[in-house]
Amino acid sequence: AMRVPGKQAFVQALYAVVNRLEGLKVNISTGKAVTPRELQDEGFEEIVVATGVRPRIPEFPGVTEGLEGKIDGVTVATYAELISCEKTPGEYVAVIGAGGIGYDVAEFLLEDRQGTPQTLNSWNSQWGVVEASDVHGNLSTPKPERPQRRVVMLQRKPTRMGRSLGKTTGWVHRATVAMGGTEQIVGVTYEKIDSEGLHITVPVEDPQVTLKKIKQVKSGTFEGRTLDRAEKQELLEQIERETKENREQRVINVDTVVLCTGQESIRPEGAEQEGASNVHIIGGADVAAELDAKRAIRQAVELAARI
């Protein structure tokens, strides 16, 4: 996370935790997989499973081959492989998934600063902030830096992209990717990845028009007439059917596809054994969906207070 633009503060947070652990003489052992049963056999009275998450891999043709490097001219990477620099992106990148991770990855691709913070002058220029006292509101025309790559973001839902982002900071992420000229496509069905790029289908009708129709039907009126319950259900099913059937194919000639399609918990064997009241699962290992660092930290603090 600390390599994502705007999140460099994680570096200092991690250093603080490491220093605290060293000061408390905590023994940290790495490079070996263990199970709760093995730790119980060694005499540990309480066991905390905080093993985090792994990227969820979608299932459609070309994903597995791409991850294994078997597609000529196209790199397929998980978000973890990308941000850790295990795999290097090209010049034209498709980001599959538009949740919080998808937006972080898009910003990383547009503004890859190799983990160094953005300078104040660069930030001021990007957002149009000026120090001249004679400028109204100290704001002028934003002058964002030239994006380092061409990025297209895709999501399956037909809803407006970025709706699930945080209420206080979501607008910043949406504005940042917009400044980078990111193309955004919603209502996508992923068909395959091959040497030509990413193959998808999209609705023929603008998803925003479809959503407007659905909203009207659910309100009980449509095209000037009042609907009863049966008519509403029939129209909603018709709209859904037409959306699935009336689609067009599209090939996006990207050289890189990044998978930001959710996460799944990592749990060692036996972590959920029945009757093991001294085995505690927290953080991403507990619930991977919409993983929230604040929630994970709260779970850890509350558990530590109990034991």
Language model segments and positions:
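Short polybasic amphipathic segments
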Residues: 196-201
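Pocket-edge structural micro-motifs
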Residues: 186, 202, 283
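Residue-level signal for pocket-adjacent positions within structured domains
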Residues: 5, 71-72, 77, 185
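Rossmann-like dinucleotide/flavin-binding elements
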Residues: 29-40, 50-66, 72-165, 205-307
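N-terminal Rossmann-like dinucleotide/flavin-binding domain of flavoprotein oxidoreductases
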Residues: 1-44, 162-188, 226
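Short, exposed beta-strand/loop patches in secreted or surface proteins that constitute
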Residues: 189-193
